[in-house]
Amino acid sequence: MITAGLTSDSARIRIINDWVYHNHGFGKNNQFFVVPALGPTPVQVLETGGDCGDKSRLVSAMLRELGIQSGLVMIFSCRDCMPIHTLVEARYEGGRMVVDPIWDIDYPAADGRFLGVRDLAGTSLGRDRLAQLQLQRGTADKIRWMPENEATFDFAKPLNWDKNLVTRFAAYGLSLLGYDPGQLFRPQFLEDPKLALTLALLAVAAMIVAANFVVRAISELCNKYT
């Protein structure tokens, strides 16, 4: 196991991010589970690689296997823009930290901690870290091509809560319950096609059972009064 001998979650998170970065290529993984809309499974990404969303999905899945809470985060250039990049935010012993498996980058703080999305938003710390690594690794490294906006976290979030009426209503409901939607980890079923399909089928089955129960109840009620 690539995390053998590591004693902290931050070390495990960093080594998994680095391993996924070096595992196969960076092109979009066109495999999928059952239907194309579900995208590739973490195992399919493990076998053939993938782009930022694909590799981030694999990192998050591997972290969950270690019991480390994590989720995908999307980066937006502006509040109403489309997402331009995907990476991972994970919980470690000091809070939350961001790792990016498409560029092999994390964001350490000067005091030995690591930075999460909330720490990076509204600052130049992400871009400063990028410039530092570009200088350290030299022109032969892939990171020289990383654009600054992929290290800018001002509008980063796990879900686009403004996408439609349903997501806005969900965000409002979470706020009423005392949760900050922007600080919630992305639900696992959005990252695992098999789990998403399983939950969808269970929901359909539950609706069928409920509908059957209602029909039978109405039928018995009608028979009682006829």
Residue ranges and their predicted role:
Residues 1-3, 193, 221:
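Linear, non-domain "peripheral" regions
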Residues 57-132:
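Hydrophobic/aromatic-rich core segments of domains that either
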Residues 203-220:
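Alpha-helical transmembrane segments
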Residues 1-50:
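Secondary-structure boundary elements
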Residues 105-183:
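Extracytoplasmic/lumenal ectodomains and periplasmic regions of secretory and membrane proteins
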Residues 183-205:
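Juxtamembrane/start-of-transmembrane alpha-helix segments at the extracytoplasmic/lumenal side
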Residues 220-226:
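Short, charged juxtamembrane terminal tails flanking transmembrane helices
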Residues 53:
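Soluble catalytic regions of membrane-associated enzymes that act on cell-envelope
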